[in-house]
Each structure stands twice: as C-alpha cells, then as structure tokens.
Amino acid sequence: QKISYAIPGSSLTASWVELGPANVGGRTRGITWDPNDPTGKTVWAGGVTGGLWYNNDIANVNSSWIKVNDFWQTLSISKIIFDTINKKTAYVSTGEGFGARAGIGAGIWKTTDGGINWYKLSSTNGFLYSNDMTIRTENNKSVIYAAIDANFYMSTFSNTANVGLYRSADNGLTWTQTLPIIDSANTAKVPFAPASIQISKNNKIWVGTKASPNGNTNRGGGYILSSTNGIDWTVVKKFTVNNGYGRVSIAVAPSNANVIYAFVENNNKLENLYRSDDEGLTWVTLAKPKNYEYRTPADDFTRGQAWYDQAIAVDPNNPNTVIVGGIDLFKSTDGGTTWNQISKWYNWNAKYSYVHADQHAILYKPNSSTTALFANDGGIFYTNNLGAADTANVISHVSKAYNVTQFYAGAIHPEIGKSFFLAGSQDNGTQRFTNPSFSNTTTATGGDGGFCFIDQTNPKFQITSYVYNSYYLSSDSGKSFTQTLIDNDDIGSFINPATYDNNLHILYSNSSRDYLVRIKNITNTPKLDYISV
C-alpha cells in the first residue's frame, strides 16, 4: 500500500488540478435553451461523457461554461428538457444510445428549482441509454416520454430488456413502455426501438425508429409512428432500409402540423430525406445535399455515418426552411428542393463558417428564425444570423471552458517541473498541453487522437497517432509532426493499442492479426518491420 501511494496521483489525499483543455469542447448531444432566462441567453448542454453544464451568455464567445456536478453516478448526458408547465422543473437523460461502446448512463435526473439541485429518479435505474426525451401537455398535465435503447458496455450488450418508449404521467415516479411490438414476424415480440420523438403543433406525438437490438427478421428500423394519446399508436410510414439499422430522425414543422421531415439511414449511409405535407399520409423524396468535403461522397453528406451523424430541425416560423446535419450542415429554404451548405470542417477555402464535423443536434431558439445552436463532436456552436450562413462566416464555436473532451491516452514530458504533455482525444486530435493550470491547448495532430508517446530519454522525439496504424513522429520536441512512421488503416483497431520502449526507442502497435507492428530506431532512422505472434 505504501508503494502504491508513492506513485504520483495515487495518494488518498492528493489534490487534482483541472488542466482543460479550455478551448476544445467535445462530443455533445444534449442542448436546450433555459426558459427561465428572460434575456434568452442561458443554454444548458451535456457532453456524452463529460457531464452537465450551463452558459449564462451563449451569444458571447468569451462566456465560460459552468459545470453542474462532476460526481453524478454517470457523466454521460444525452438529452436535457424543461417542463412545459412548470419551467423550474427539468429532466436530464443519460447514456449515449447511438454509437458502438458509447458512454453508459444510469437513469434520468430531475430538478425542481431551475437547475440548482438535482436528484436521480429511482424509477429510471434501468434506463441506461437514451436516444431522446420530450414532454407533452396532456389534460393540463406534463407527461414525459423517454426513448430508451441498448448498447455495448465492457464487451457486453446491455439494457436490451428495457428498450422502448417510456411514458410517465406522474412527474417521473412511474413509467410504462408504450410502443407496440414490431410485428408478428418478430418471434421475440419486442417493441419498436425509438430513435427520435417530436410533438406537433396539434399536440400529436411522433416517433422515428431504429433497428431493435432484440428479435429477428423485422427488427423495426425505418418506421414512423404517431399517437394522439401516447398510448395507442399508428404506423404512419415504413421506409425501405433492407432490415439494416434504419435510424429515422423526424422533424415536425412547429408552425404547421401537416409538414413533417424525415432523415432516414440505410446500412450506415443516407437512404434519403423525405417530406410530408399531409401529416404523413403521403411522402416525397427530397434532393440530397451535395457535400464536397474531403472524402465525402457527393450523394451522402453523412460520409457513411448516417447511423451516427444525424440531425434535423425546422424553422419555428417557416415550414419550408429546414437544416440538416451529417458531417457538415446544410440549409434549405424551399422545403428541401435545393440545399446550401452552411458549414465546413475541412474545406478552408469555402465561404461559410468552420463548424466541427459530426453533427448530433440542431436547436433553433424558440420563436426565432435567425438564432440556433449546433452540437457535434467539437462541442457547441452558435449563430444569430442564419440568413447569411451560406455566404458568410457567422457561426461561432462557443465552448470556452466546456471541458468535456474525451481522452484515450497521454504522454508526460520527463523533465521535472516542465508542464508539457500530449493527450490523444476522440475526434479532437492529439492535444498539446503546456501550462500547469486550466488553459487552452494547441493541436499537435488532428482527427481522432489515440496513443501517444514522449521518449523519456530523448524527449525531443515524440509520437502521436490517428486511427488504426497511423503514427506520426516529431523530432523537434513536439513543435511539428511531419514524419509518418506508418499509415495503414487496414490493420489494427480504431483506437489502436500501442506501447513504446524508451530504452531501445522502439514503437510496438497492434495489428489485430497474427503479428505486431514494430518500428525500431525512432531517434535515428526509423525502420518498420513486423513480429509474428
């Protein structure tokens, strides 16, 4: 025990200092405007593994986010909603249902004092992954609907028994699964798995589905269902999704209950965008936004990630104005006949704003056609000038002190007292830390950052990585990483395990095959070879 306490950071009385990064942000799905702020500036957001936060002046890029609590049972925030009747009451669902081996949740949290104090609803212990959540007014009462899913946790697919749409008419005390079973061909007799929930202007509730992790034959992906009472459901539409994942995100026009948009995935890719002008009786296929970003097919603006990067929202005042998000953001002002790109993540010469890749949520400010929030793998972005978004840089990154970056690995400089280390993060590159306190970082290498190393005997040599077997070398103390040691995305894992021999200056990495990748002589002339195992 005394030996373990001698390891830096292992003492029971050790004090931890938050280092950031203060300028990066991270994957976010849950965002909402605070209805209790008469100025309309307060926003709540949650990282999918970074906890719950709020910002009192979202229009100010220098306004810092404030964390609510680092010690909830889970920090995986998926959705945040305020009660439509009692605006001091809000609910936060947890667990990221979309994505493989994502952050696991632990239920739904509630506040009745506007977010000062929070407590977990014990009735939701089995709600480990949530895709969506909303509140509908029924007979002058607030009724909560939560879309509960399953996902991998520690190599086990968990929460499958609780998949479904849960309804609570008593403020979260009790819940009832309300969706019907998929169909008689599914011998498991399991309910549809909800992916998205919308409430229309006439108070009808709509659900878009995804493939259920349970059952067989027809797994229920690619459907839209509706209900007038939240209990009895009608299948409105079944899209052709080849029995794949079939995730469907729906967006009902706030100003016109007849107008509904659907964003449909099929076998990972964009299947199509659809629109109905008669409450789902008939549907027309819309044009597909054209994206000319790096490695993005012109006919699939999700770049094969529609199962994951999927967001859609309709202008509160105009049913013909709609925004969709895949890798980037696109806006249509003619009901989906034509689209204009309004963000970029890679094409720096484009005329519109930089917005981080992988869109997960789009949220208009209530009653506003010009102001909106965007949540993605880079955190939170904001604009109050949507009308100019296709021709000007009007969307800002508003993630100051929003410390939700997802790190995989780190490397510490060996020099005593030197505040320098590298850390590889999910979709935010390998970050370079140079300060002993909470501060901004700089990007050493981009994309997804994985394992990284600083040679402990000759620290001017440093290594970063991208996905699979992509490793980069710096020989100038981390100032630049211009040498590629290996770039092979056919072997290894997404975030690929690796280790470094500081004495012999050798990098070893996983290949997911019957050999290891070895790169010798890192501090001189690196040489690549393979070791059979």
Feature roles, as predicted:
Residues 1-533:
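Beta-propeller blade termini and top-face loops
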